[in-house]
């Protein structure tokens, strides 16, 4: 003993991580990833092109960035000592390659968006396979949310977009009728047509707010994962997105209608109608984050009122020191 105090240092990865992913295994993982990306390069290029050309799918290129951030910030909780799982990994890689071959054969019958969606789905399956093949089942389980979140990088197929738009348009028209009545403006609704004094409003495809609602849904999923302690509260937050999106659409329709009634039908060309979407989207974030804060605050209040339960929970989470 030299009398100097012993200082414990915490490694970047848990003990055993270097042995698990080091050496040839790490390089094999990198090589497999590069090889898969090379095979799917035309699909990736089409995916980026779609994101840059279509506002509805412009968010998809951010999804891998978010997943990567979650993996990096949560790296200490990942099961780096997990053993490779060649059977499920190899099966998923082969499934992804078979899927891309089938998609290429069925290409003439598919729309541009559906083609990109299927190709990116095949790529994602192959990437999951690489994860199992080189990092193992336990690692994939510990990285469940970031890896599953990659599903959002697949563009919504045309059929899904059509059904979601129809639902949002009809629901927004129905709620708008009630909002006009509450606001004191006479209204007569027939389907998606709203007749108010001086003008007839049609809740069209552009009024569905599908892009804002979809982005809000993805935002709520991330917020629930980061800030809410239980799946139940996370589901409450995510489940509030669609009603919130419909309410946002209805309030916007009411504002446009009120402007037309008060100042003349030419107000249909007002910026609120043409370019007001981002403003109402930001406004819809306020109640969403207030709900997230309320759900999180409820947990903190419960822990403050029952410290014994929190102490028991803390003891369960402490590692065995014996």
Question: Which functions belong to the PLM regions below?
Answer:
Residues 2-322:
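Hydrophobic N-terminal alpha-helices or hydrophobic patches in metabolic proteins across all domains
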